[in-house]
A protein has these predicted regions:
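Hydrophobic face of amphipathic alpha-helices that form TPR/SEL1-like repeat modules
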Residues: 2-37, 359
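Residue-level signal for inorganic ion chemistry
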Residues: 39, 75, 97, 119, ...
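Structural signal for hydrophobic packing residues in well-ordered secondary-structure cores
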Residues: 64, 68, 83-90, 94, ...
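Conserved C-terminal structural/oligomerization subdomain of aldehyde/semialdehyde dehydrogenase
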Residues: 38-44, 204, 228, 265, ...
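Glycine-rich loop-to-alpha-helix module at the N-terminal edge of alpha/beta enzyme cores
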Residues: 40-130, 140
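ALDH superfamily catalytic-core signature
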Residues: 238-381, 404, 410, 444, ...
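Short, well-ordered beta-strand elements within core beta-sheets of diverse protein domains
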Residues: 42-48, 63-69, 155, 264-267, ...
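Rossmann-like NAD(P) dinucleotide-binding subdomain of oxidoreductase/dehydrogenase enzymes
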Residues: 131-276, 325, 401, 466
């Protein structure tokens, strides 16, 4: 393994976190953590052993008993300290994230900040977790409900947002009174470990956040472990479908955000500069590795005249190392890069035109990086591979239609429904679009319509499995269960004998 001259993480082999202790795994199988800009191995990530995973989940269950009885005010105080520590360490976290994932430092800071916003929102848990009360539903009888934690929960995280996605999960779960067993992506485990380290410093008790590592074996363990009541997952469709099926079969709640094909609709009355810049930034930023990237542009009517200018602007963007002054970084793996290139090439053979071609881009100072340049593919039809599959690379697929109705029909026929945007100066068009389109997140003149944590990250159709969404009020609902109490404190109970009839609440006795 390559020795780093200026390490930003203290270990070469990533450790498990069990019972508040970072411990070396006894694994026999390890995954290389590779800097995608240089091709260098920067750490080894273990496939945690069955004994280690079982110890982690049993410890989580034991620790949660006391934590659930900790006052919500004291749990919130831990989160207040946690958000402070994240802010104080934000530059170091961004550097770790950039080294293992490849995105630019500015984008890494944005990744972290959007997760930090969720941490801040958990500091309202006293309000978010409130139940309901109705007095005198019947004579001397009150009914009230409150939310209780589930117990042990689990989070399975993707590679593309090493900070934001874990922070969507464990801060909400534990502030609601649960414990969480976290499994970061084996490609980018270092950011999660730093976030876990800061959580311990903030006062999260030992065992309330445990971290294990691995691939399929770790996923299967999480799906099968009887102590785990709920699973949160963000990632690709194949894995998400599998986790949802296996987890729910075992009686667990599962929320899974899956793939996407997000369309950006450009109306002829849109602000041209804003629309074109938004398309380029959303599709090319983060090397296109965002589940909310506007990877598909739909130009309506005369707006198609702007396509050459779109291509000209996109051609000026250059990939490079994230810790340099680059427009965007590398793909996460060579396999991901090769797949993106294949989808473009196959579509070109079917008649698509590659106006901006990033397939052969190189970065001379880092020849082993997973480089692909900005690409714009036009004359695309809905039957081409670059449209039917999520490229998840810095490529913008361009289609044209005659009317807004045509654009909406195209979007609604696509199996995915993660998000979409429209660029227009017409309130009538915007309102029609937001009402008729079938997507979880809708932007109006907004390129990446990811909602702030006062709301929830939603989705539609093949982009989601499970019916309760991430963070916000729905996130709290996912990690809690409702208990309803009906109490009768009649000052003078009457001896009317036993009755076999169903009591009629609301009828004064």
């Amino acid at each position: 393994m390559m020795r780093r001259t200026a390490p930003i993480f203290s270990v070469a082999t990533v450790k498990n976190l069990i019972d508040g202790k970072f411990t070396e795994s006894k694994a026999t199988k390890f995954y290389d953590v590779i800097n995608p800009a240089t091709g260098s191995v920067i750490a080894k990530c273990p496939q945690s052993t069955p004994e280690e995973m079982r110890a982690a989940v049993e410890n989580s269950a034991a620790a949660q008993v006391a934590w659930r009885n900790t006052s919500v005010g004291n749990r919130v105080r831990v989160m207040l300290k946690y958000q402070q520590l994240i802010r104080e360490n934000s530059k170091q976290i961004a550097e770790i994230l950039t080294e293992e994932q490849g995105k630019t430092l500015g984008d890494a800071e944005g990744d972290l900040f959007r997760g930090l916003e969720v941490v801040e929102h958990t500091c309202s848990m006293g309000t978010l977790i409130m139940g309901e009360t109705v007095e005198n539903v019947s004579a001397h009888m009150d009914t009230y409900s409150y939310r209780q934690p589930l117990g042990v929960t689990a989070g399975i995280c993707p590679f593309n947002f090493p900070a934001m996605i874990p922070l969507w999960m464990f801060p909400v779960a534990i502030t609601a009174g649960n414990a969480m067993l976290l499994k970061p992506s084996e490609k980018v485990p270092l950011t999660s470990m730093k976030l876990a380290e800061l959580a311990l410093q903030a006062g999260v008790p030992a065992g309330i956040v445990n971290v294990i590592h691995g691939g399929h074996d770790a996923v299967n363990f999480i799906c099968d472990a009887p102590e785990i009541r709920a699973i949160s997952f963000v990632g690709g469709n194949a894995a998400g479908e599998y986790i949802h099926a296996r987890g729910t079969k075992n009686g667990k709640r599962v929320q899974a955000n899956l793939g996407a094909k997000n369309h950006g609709v450009i109306m002829p009355d849109a602000d041209k500069d804003h629309a074109l810049n938004s398309l380029i930034g959303s599709s090319i930023g983060a090397c296109g590795q965002r589940c909310m990237a506007l990877s598909t542009a739909v130009f309506v009517g005369d707006a198609k005249k702007w396509i050459p200018e779109l291509a000209e602007r996109a051609s000026k963007l250059r990939p490079g190392p994230g810790n340099k002054n680059s427009d965007f970084g590398p793909m996460i793996t060579k396999e991901a890069r090769d797949r993106a290139i294949r989808l473009i090439t196959e579509s070109e053979k079917l008649g698509a035109k590659v106006l901006v071609d990033g397939r052969n881009v190189t970065v001379p100072e880092h020849p082993n990086g997973n480089w692909i340049g900005a690409s714009v593919v036009t004359d695309v039809t809905t039957e081409m591979p670059c449209y039917k599959e999520e490229i998840f690379g810095p490529a913008l697929v361009v289609l044209t239609v005659d009317t807004l109705d045509d654009a909406i029909n195209m979007i609604n026929k696509n199996p995915y429904g993660n998000g979409t945007s429209i660029f227009t100066s017409s309130g009538i068009a915007a309102r029609k679009f937001q009402h008729d389109v079938d997507a979880g997140q809708v932007g109006i003149n907004v390129p990446i319509p990811v909602p702030l944590p006062y709301f929830s990250f939603t989705g539609s159709r093949a982009s989601i499995r499970g019916d309760i969404n991430f963070y916000g009020k729905q996130g709290v609902q996912f990690y809690t269960q409702v208990k309803t109490i009906s109490s009768n404190w009649n000052p003078k109970f009457k001896n009317t004998g036993a009755t076999v009839n169903m009591p009629i609440l609301g009828k004064d006795q």
